[in-house]
Amino acid sequence: MLSWVVTFLVVALIAGILGFGGIAGASIEIAKVIFFIAVVLFLISAVVGLARGRTRV
């Protein structure tokens, strides 16, 4: 249990450093780009799957 506490403490400290630094704005833009790429890839794979006759998405 103590290892989980230490792990979350480290993650929280890194998030705090990145959030209060100037990197947060750049991270948001990168996350937006990755999100839209993932949505486009999902839609392409769904259309290709439906075109092949598979019903699972």
Curated annotation (Swiss-Prot):
Name listed for the protein in its UniProt record: UPF0391 membrane protein RPD_3366
Pfam families on file: DUF1328
Transmembrane segment boundaries: 4-24, 30-50
Location in or out of the cell: Cell membrane
UniProt keyword annotations, A-Z: Cell membrane, Membrane, Transmembrane, Transmembrane helix
Predominant localisation class: membrane
UniProt membrane topology term: Multi-pass membrane protein
Similarity annotation: Belongs to the UPF0391 family.
